[in-house]
């Protein structure tokens, strides 16, 4: 329900901005409607395709090995743990995979709750205790339960639409003279510059939302396995070497992430200290 309300609110915001721009610029409504349709199609197409292909693309990008029949005790434990957590969260069993990497990380992805993936690095399995790894798995299961992959796709689509539409509307105003003639060269250059600038701002918004969802996934893990296990997992991450930021959409749903300075505005994860503090402040889970 919250995801639907968010989507409706963002679409209302698009229409509100659309009408303001028409009023300020004097651009004909039919021209603006055509551009808005183009921006929406272009803005959402890439995000939706990425979502639909996210599971297979993720497995390919990390060379992940899906666990169908456990070959050892670790794989058996992984399947049993994810199955138990998914059952408690009211979810179908996700696909579980392991990928070889020294980086201590895990991620969740997939277009729907019925077609989701939880992948874990060998580095995480080697570096963490079972309790800590259990908390990380619960964090990823919480991402799936909350539908974060779909929510991020909708948000990215709306942001893409805003960037394309506003950039081209403003470029049209600047590139059009008093006689109504538009210089295509000036229009193209200005629209490209504005799309770059607004694209950076849109990335900051998307990453802010991703960091917000990380706090929620941490809380979801605490609800599933107890907050002390999740705190222990995050503290373990603090003691390890600086992790590598995952690429693309995987970064938003991994357990780990980099930090630092102004660059933190573009990171998918909050600082570990803030995540630990937020967990300690979960009064309703003090007994766990």
From Swiss-Prot:
Keywords, A to Z, come to: Cell inner membrane, Cell membrane, Hydrolase, Membrane, Metal-binding, Metalloprotease, Protease, Transmembrane, Transmembrane helix, Zinc
Q: Which InterPro entries match?
A: HtpX_protease (IPR050083), Pept_M48_protease_HtpX (IPR022919), Peptidase_M48 (IPR001915)
Q: Which Pfam families match?
A: Peptidase_M48
What topology does the record note for this protein and the membrane? Answer: Multi-pass membrane protein
Per the UniProt record, which EC number(s) apply here?
Answer: 3.4.24.-
Q: Name one GO biological process term.
A: proteolysis
Which cofactors does the annotated protein need, by name?
Answer: Zn(2+)
Top EC class per UniProt? Answer: hydrolase
Q: Where does the sequence pass through the membrane? A: 4-24, 33-53, 146-166, 186-206
Q: Where found in the cell?
A: Cell inner membrane
Q: Which residues bind Zn(2+)?
A: 139, 143, 214
Q: Give the active-site positions.
A: 140
Q: How is the cofactor bound?
A: Binds 1 zinc ion per subunit.
Q: Name one GO molecular function term.
A: metalloendopeptidase activity
Keyword Cell membrane among record annotations? yes
Ribosomal protein as a keyword of this entry, yes or no, is no
Gene Ontology CC terms, in alphabetical order: plasma membrane
**Family assignment from sequence similarity:** Belongs to the peptidase M48B family.
Against PANTHER family, the record matches this protein to: PROTEASE HTPX
Q: What is this protein called?
A: Protease HtpX
Naturally occurring in which organism (per UniProt): Histophilus somni (strain 2336) (Haemophilus somnus)
């Amino acid at each position: 329900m919250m995801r639907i309300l968010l989507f409706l609110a963002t679409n209302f915001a698009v229409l509100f901005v659309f009408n303001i721009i028409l009023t300020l610029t004097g651009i004909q409504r039919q021209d603006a409607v055509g551009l808005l349709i183009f921006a929406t199609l272009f803005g959402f197409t890439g995000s939706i395709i990425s979502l639909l292909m996210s599971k297979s693309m993720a497995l390919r990008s990390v060379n992940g090995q899906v666990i169908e029949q456990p070959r050892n005790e670790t794989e058996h434990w992984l399947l049993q743990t994810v199955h138990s957590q998914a059952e408690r969260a009211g979810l179908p069993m996700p696909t579980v995979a392991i990928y070889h990497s020294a980086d201590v990380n895990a991620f969740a992805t997939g277009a729907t709750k019925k077609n989701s993936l939880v992948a874990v690095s060998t580095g995480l399995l080697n570096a963490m205790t079972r309790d800590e790894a259990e908390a990380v798995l619960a964090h990823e299961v919480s991402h799936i339960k909350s539908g974060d992959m779909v929510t991020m796709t909708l948000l990215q689509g709306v942001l893409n639409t805003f960037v394309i539409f506003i950039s081209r509307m403003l470029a049209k105003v600047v590139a059009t003279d008093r006689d109504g003639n538009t210089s295509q060269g000036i229009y193209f250059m200005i629209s490209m510059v504005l799309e770059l600038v607004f694209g950076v701002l849109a990335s900051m918004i998307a990453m802010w939302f991703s960091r917000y969802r990380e706090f929620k996934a941490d809380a979801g893990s605490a609800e599933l396995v107890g907050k002390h296990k999740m705190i222990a997992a995050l503290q373990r991450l603090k003691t390890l070497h600086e992790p590598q930021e995952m690429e693309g959409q995987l970064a938003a749903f991994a357990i780990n992430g980099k930090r630092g300075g102004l660059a933190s505005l573009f990171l998918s994860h909050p600082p570990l200290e803030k995540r630990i503090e937020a967990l300690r402040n979960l009064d309703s889970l003090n007994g766990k």
